[in-house]
Every structure is written in C-alpha cells, then in structure tokens.
C-alpha cells in the first residue's frame, strides 16, 4: 500500500508508516505523475485536488485533507470516481481564534484601547467563528456574528446582517470559506465599496481565505493612511504577496493562523483515524499523545487578573509579532512563503498552559478562553 503525504504534515510519516509505504512530497507542487500507483493521498490546503491531478491515479481510493477547509478539493469529482474523501473539521479552530486574539491584544496595546470596550464582528460562524465567539464572550467581549447560511438553517444564535456588522463592529474578523457561486458567494466579499465605507478606527482581520478580501482595493484603502488597520494571514494570490500592500498592513503572516502544534496534530490524527476505519484497521491515534510538554506548562497567579495580565499570559503563549517579523524579513526570498510554513515553529495553544490561583483570582473566564485552570486552596 502506497500513501502519498504532504511533507509538511507533522506526525504523518510516523503514523501512516504503520499502514504502508509513505512517500513524502511538497504539497503545492504535486503532479499527476506523483499519483501513479498511489492508494491514498494525504494533503493540506495548498494541494488542489482536481481532474488534472488525479488523471493518472488509477489506484487512488482515499483522499484526506488535514485541514478544516475543503474548497481546494473537487469533492464531486472524487465522488464520481468512487474515491473516498475526508477532512478534519475544526482541527485548527483554536489556533485561528488565538491568532485573532493575539492581533487584538497587540493592537490594543499599540493603539491604546481596551479589548473589553471593543465590539468584535465575526463573519462566518462555522467551526472557527463559533469557537472565537465562545472565547470572546466567555471573557466578556461583545460579539456580533454574521452567517446567512447558519441563520437560514435555523441556528438559534442571534445573527446580524453584514451591513450592520460592518457599521457597528470595531474589529471585523473573517472566517468564511471561499465560494464564487450560490446565494452568498464570498469571493471579494470585502470589496472596494465596503472597504471605502469602513471607518478610520476599524480593524479588519482576514485569517480565512485570501480572495475573501479584494487585496487591490484593500491596498488602495490603506493608502489613505487615515488610521484604518488591517492584518492578513492569507493573501489573494498566495504564495505571491503584493509587496506594495505588505508595508501597509499592521500584521502579515504566511497562512499560519491555524498552524499551532495541537491543531496540526489534530488534523493528522483525524485523517489517520478515518483512513484506518476505511481500510478496516483497528489502530487509532490521539493528538494529545503526540504533543510535548509546553515550554511554560504552569503559571501561578497571586491576584485577580486584569487586562495587563491577560496580555502577558496570551502573548507568552503566542505573540503574532514573532511571525510578522519573520514574514517581513524573509518574504522577498524565492519560495519563502511555503518555506516559512514548512519550517514553522512549534507554536502551542493556551490549553498547553495551566493557570493556578485561588478563587479570588477569578480563573473561570480564562478557562473559557482556553487555558487549563487549577484553583488552589
């Protein structure tokens, strides 16, 4: 059995080698010739699975993507060919939410506002958007959510129209898939008209898919230099990056918002377990068994936390400025975008850290944000 695996998928070689011969390849440059004699294909979002890619894959029976997003896979084609497909919904939701929160916390410090006085507008209430909503509301931040699909499905949450959200939110964060058809297409959802309508004191964060925002229009909006702020983890034509847009962004990173070690381990184990089930193998893997101890596994608090404490704790685990600085330093080199993703550091989630304190420390909201908490006597 031959299993072709994206070389950037952590723990994959160790796990899948229990099932057959593992062949590692860079996901973005896969060709039809690479899939000759391949029984199973394990990918990430940089691999476009289409008719051209699988044209010579006569033995292919299984495709798994270790990502929450699935818009890079022609699912109808796979179904037509009798090829089983699976994804890893929700695997990276924590990492993306913590990326957004890091952007918010750093900007609050730089621009002199309190995150607790901001209204956050979340566009897209799927796995990531819903988790982010839960975290922010858990610590007392006002949230507006927009998702016409969820609303029409009968989701009982209180939804907001996109127009109202764009008017009332101080922070607008995007968490939609990329779609070009249907009732609510998201390609250039944030277009020139919308960008020009946004206030100078608003913040736009895109950690979803690059083409959700018209990058050319965003560049023109930021060139007004009126204080409007934008942070991008994804770019419209990545791995190509508009070098005129880059210096205008508050933060820029190479599509790594969901690249925390826990999230990647979850994605790998989810598709590994699906493949084991598919071939009738009883092996199963658990992400928690693969993870090392965090660099700072425990923090003791001696007083009730405040916003300064929150900033220290969250940035100790993940500070977006680290990735932003590397991105600006290295992006000019050939192949840098994918190389930064391939060599991404072992970033951890808040859950890797246990906060210890008395009942007076009021740790419960921090647990809702994702930290482990331990109330001391």
From Swiss-Prot:
Residues that bind substrate: 45, 67, 259
UniProt-annotated catalytic positions: 209, 238, 255
Family, similarity comment: Belongs to the D-isomer specific 2-hydroxyacid dehydrogenase family. PdxB subfamily.
GO cellular component, one term: cytoplasm
Entry's EC annotation: 1.1.1.290
Chain's gene name: pdxB
Pathway membership: Cofactor biosynthesis; pyridoxine 5'-phosphate biosynthesis; pyridoxine 5'-phosphate from D-erythrose 4-phosphate: step 2/5
Name of the featured protein: Erythronate-4-phosphate dehydrogenase
């Amino acid at each position: 059995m031959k299993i072709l695996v994206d070389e950037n998928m952590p723990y994959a070689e160790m796990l899948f080698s229990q099932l057959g011969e593992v062949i590692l390849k860079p996901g973005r440059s896969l060709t039809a010739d690479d899939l000759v004699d391949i029984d199973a294909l394990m990918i990430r979002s940089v691999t476009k699975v289409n008719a051209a890619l699988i044209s010579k894959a006569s033995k292919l029976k299984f495709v798994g993507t270790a990502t929450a997003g699935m818009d890079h896979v022609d699912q109808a084609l796979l179904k037509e060919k009798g090829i089983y497909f699976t994804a890893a919904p929700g695997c990276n939701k924590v990492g993306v939410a913590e990326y957004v929160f890091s952007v918010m916390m750093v900007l609050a410090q730089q621009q002199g506002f309190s995150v607790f006085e901001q209204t956050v507008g979340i566009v897209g209430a799927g796995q990531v958007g819903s988790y982010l909503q839960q975290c922010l509301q858990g610590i007392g931040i006002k949230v507006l959510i927009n998702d016409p699909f969820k609303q029409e499905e009968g989701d009982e949450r209180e939804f907001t129209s996109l127009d109202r959200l764009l008017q009332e939110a101080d922070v607008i964060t995007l968490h939609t898939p990329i779609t070009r058809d249907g009732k609510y297409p998201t390609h250039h959802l944030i277009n020139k008209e919308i960008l020009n309508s946004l206030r100078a004191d608003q913040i736009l964060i895109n950690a979803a898919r690059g083409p959700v925002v018209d990058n050319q229009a965003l560049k023109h909006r930021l060139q007004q230099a009126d204080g409007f702020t934008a942070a991008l983890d994804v770019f419209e034509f990545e791995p190509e990056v508009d070098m005129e847009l880059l210096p205008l962004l508050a933060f820029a990173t190479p599509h790594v918002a969901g690249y925390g070690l826990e999230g990647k381990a979850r994605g790998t184990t989810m598709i590994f377990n699906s493949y084991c089930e598919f071939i009738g193998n009883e092996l199963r893997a658990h992400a928690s068994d693969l993870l090392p101890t965090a660099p700072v596994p425990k923090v003791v608090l001696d007083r009730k936390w405040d916003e300064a404490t929150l900033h220290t704790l969250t940035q100790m685990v993940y500070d977006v400025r680290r990735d932003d600085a590397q991105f600006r330093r290295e992006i000019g080199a050939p192949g840098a975008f994918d190389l930064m993703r391939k060599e991404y550091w072992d970033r951890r989630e808040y859950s890797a850290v246990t906060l210890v304190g008395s009942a007076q420390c009021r740790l419960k909201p921090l647990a809702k944000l994702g930290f482990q908490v331990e109330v001391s006597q």
